[in-house]
């Protein structure tokens, strides 16, 4: 882990209590000057880190960003998300994931982005998402199944996203098979699975997911799409 991420992990584990500078230096094996640089780095990324003389530092808040450290903090999987590629802006997370897969990226590699300008849907449709308002990611899978079974992955993903939304956001989306999730008849999430396969084996599968989280009405196609914010009437944390 990078030094700033190690400090974040330590502060998160002790929050909301303070951690003394001496304790930080000892546990991370760094100087006080290095600790201060790490604190500044975290603050620059949007973390609320309070420092007090003779008390040390404590973590007060975390930014609504898809930082790997934030995803890993709540991740309960071993393979999925074992490697996370974070992008502020990209055309398509699936394009990035596809290139990484062809280069041999391991199964479970996750590509996330804050903003996407050329996301893909079915039948070649494209769509975009403003910075910091959606949950945009693509996952590399290498399932040991014949290509004919690969489409089942999209259905499994749709069910998984629906269950996650029920648990995290308290809403119950309907599934428009095979790859859309709807709230009140409007699209809130799209899933696109792209396959690279030979006759009898799957080389890799890229599963792209685009979830509308904090978009406002002006960000979306009228009458056809919605977001968790529009549905619930309040902003929703993305991590």
What residue spans do the PLM features occupy?
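Nucleotide and nucleotide-moiety/phosphate-recognizing core
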Residues: 103, 108, 128-238
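N-terminal lobe of the biotin/lipoate ligase/transferase fold
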Residues: 2-167, 189
